[in-house]
Amino acid sequence: MKMKLLMTSVLSTSLFLVACGGGSSDDGPATTNPSGTPTNNIQNPVVKVEAYTSTNLGSVAAESSILTYKMLGQSGQEVQATSLVFTPNTPPPVGGWPIVVWAHGTTGVADVCAPSKAALADSTKDLISKLLAAGYVVVAPDYEGLGTPGIHPFLNVKSEAFSITDAVVATRNYLSQRNLLTSKKWVTVGHSQGGHAALGAAQYASRAQLEYK
């Protein structure tokens, strides 16, 4: 299956913290050569899986879950983060389902601002539904420190990138345990803060040791 949907990440020129509260960027300049990117060798990356029931995608999703997983945090230490995971209501194709990561826009910096703790916005629900109907697994990370212990390092490109790459690795691990095949092909799309995160994920995609397209 070819990657056709939303291959371009949109980086907003203006980023605002809304309803949930304020914060500031602690990110330094992004490097252009991530040759020193550490590969993900985290053992047993899945911590727990819970049902996500705040939004009903039953017509196109076989499963909607909140995945707690291990990732490499901004401090260089292993931390836990959360991500929404949606699987299509159709069998995997030959080679497995490809993965699309939805990188959410700015929501705030408090734990209650984590997207997994609320219903999806209508536009996000529509996007994810279309991706599922097209046969993609959708992974939607909350990002480091949103909904889990620790500070959310807003606009830290490496933290955002590793939140994404490590969520993809953990999702594949979780689905493989259930004999559900996923392709090595994956891509990230997003807007606002998510556009920044998507660009970071592309830069540090080698961490996942898969096939970023």
Task: List the predicted regions and their residue ranges.
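Active-site glycine-rich loops that stabilize anionic/oxyanionic intermediates
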Residues: 72-74, 104-109
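Bacterial N-terminal signal peptides that target proteins for export
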Residues: 1-9
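Cap/lid segment of the alpha/beta-hydrolase catalytic domain
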Residues: 107-162
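Primarily recognizes the serine-hydrolase "nucleophile elbow" in alpha/beta-hydrolase
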Residues: 170-213
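C-terminal motif of bacterial Sec signal peptides marking the signal peptidase cleavage site
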Residues: 16-19
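Alpha/beta-hydrolase active-site loop
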Residues: 154-177
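Catalytic-loop region of hydrolases
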Residues: 21-92
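Short beta-strand element of the alpha/beta-hydrolase
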Residues: 82, 95-107
